[in-house]
Amino acid sequence: MTSRTPTTVPCLLGPTASGKTAAALALAARHPVEIISVDSALVYREMDIGTAKPTAEERAVAPHHLIDIVDPTDSYSAAQFRADTLRLTGEIHARGRLPLLVGGTMLYYKALTQGLNDLPAADADLRATLDADAAREGWPAMHARLAAVDPVTAARLAPNDSQRIQRALEVFMLTGQAMSALLAAPARVDDAAAAWRFVPVALEPSDRGVLHARIEKRFDAMLANGFVDEVVKLRERGDLSPEMPSMRCVGYRQVWEYLDGAVDYSTMRDKGVFATRQLCKRQLTWLRSMTERVVVDCCDPHATARVLEAIEALL
């Protein structure tokens, strides 16, 4: 039996504020594109302003997938993303249309293209126990507990990073092995992605200062457009907490802190900008590890045209 040549699927990746949406919509104006979002914040409903979610007008240009698919009380894993994206890619291709992956959540992209490690699924009862321990002892104490069983993971986590500390402890308690050891093991091999050749086209800045200025301008625009009110409404639901993955999204945790009275407005704004820049830095580090990527300078005034050229050369 002869193996079929994998079908190329372009993936437009880049840090926040690099111009991905504009380039994707420009491609959609020229090709029958359906966009698959690669963004862990856009999956949440009721979180529009702080996630810079594509507008209704933008989403009318081309079908968008994996946006507004879960409630902020829920979580959405890299494993779910991989399964959904492989399914959607096949469905879009079968319709005779072009799947285009767009986003900046590099953990999702890595799971899609490199497979998944054998980490156990979340255990609600165990998490409740860990939450109760943390409420009694504090997260720094939980961090110390993690350091005793998985010093490698503990060394890269802040003592108040409740979400990741909880997950690392959960993995150890379920498997008896350190999460760092499980992640270092070879990813599980499967053939689910074998039909596709995912090719990253990366929007990266030749001048990081230009991107930082865009980030600052965009965060200020979010605040002007009602970001604080959006978080007020989320808090008023009564079923969300700052420890949930949705409320740990960049910007939301800083506004939540402001609404708690822990910081003033100016400090909240500065912390939000700083956190977004730190996210950008992490995204660029991921991108630069992808030696196979096609790079487009997002500072180039003709960046959108360069992206179109790069993607159309793949088709």
Swiss-Prot record:
One of its GO terms (molecular function) is ATP binding. InterPro entries: Dimethylallyltransferase, IPT, P-loop_NTPase. Residues 39-42, 163-167, 248-253 are annotated as: Interaction with substrate tRNA. Pfam families: IPPT. It comes from the Bacteria. The keyword Transmembrane helix does not apply. GO terms for biological process: tRNA modification. Its EC number is 2.5.1.75. Keywords: ATP-binding, Magnesium, Nucleotide-binding, Transferase, tRNA processing. Its cofactor is Mg(2+). The record marks T105, R127 as: Interaction with substrate tRNA. Substrate binds at T16, A17, S18, G19, K20, T21. ATP binds at G14, P15, T16, A17, S18, G19, K20, T21. It catalyses: adenosine(37) in tRNA + dimethylallyl diphosphate = N(6)-dimethylallyladenosine(37) in tRNA + diphosphate. Coiled coil: none annotated. SUPFAM superfamilies: P-loop containing nucleoside triphosphate hydrolases. Monomer. HAMAP family: IPP_trans (MF_00185). PANTHER family: TRNA DIMETHYLALLYLTRANSFERASE. Catalyzes the transfer of a dimethylallyl group onto the adenine at position 37 in tRNAs that read codons beginning with uridine, leading to the formation of N6-(dimethylallyl)adenosine (i(6)A). Belongs to the IPP transferase family. This is tRNA dimethylallyltransferase.
